[in-house]
Amino acid sequence: MEQTLDITKLWDRLASCPGVEAIALGGSRAAGNADEKSDYDVYVYVCGELTAGEREPILAAYCDRMEIDNRYWEREDNCRLKNGVDLDIIYRSLPDFERGLRWVVKEGNASNGYTTCMWHNLNTCRILYDRDGRLAALQQEYAVPYPKILKHNIIERNLKLLGGVLPSYDMQIKKARQRGDFVSVNHRTAAFLES
């Protein structure tokens, strides 16, 4: 019970920071299938800047290990709570997030992998705090069937990468094999299978 109370207080402290518009819980904890090894995946949506200097003292009260402002995938703080549970906090610009959703879902644009990950994250997250209801409004706006044009564009883009164009994965695998570069063969084969 204390773990839930402490973590709730952490969300409250983050929510009190200027510029924080919304906070959401994602991953296995939001989906209801967390186990004893599950971490917390938390998304903090901001308008403006929430600096590392502002975040660090808040997190220090709850965490015994912190890596502040990592940028491996997104802007994030990777921490270990004092109870031993890992915590990943991702900081996202709410306006940029909205633009990205529109670009994918409404405009049907595809990327190389991860095209719909933000949309899925929005639709499966549990909102913990929503200052003006903007995140909930986005959830409602984007709770739509999978757009046919998006499906078409993802398939078309990925089919080209599988073969038939100069930088396609099959050509990259062939070239790596000819060079005896088995690390590249493995890497490109994984990308091929991902597509």
Model-predicted segments: where are they?
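Metal-dependent nucleotidyltransferase catalytic core
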Residues: M1-E21, A31-K37, V44-N112
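Residue-identity detector for threonine
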Residues: T4, T8, T115-T116, T124, ...
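Short, hydrophobic/aromatic alpha-helical segments in well-folded domains
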Residues: L10, M171-Q172, R188
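Conserved NTP/Mg2+-binding pocket subregion across the NTase superfamily
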Residues: D64-R177
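Small-residue-rich helix-loop
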Residues: R188-S195
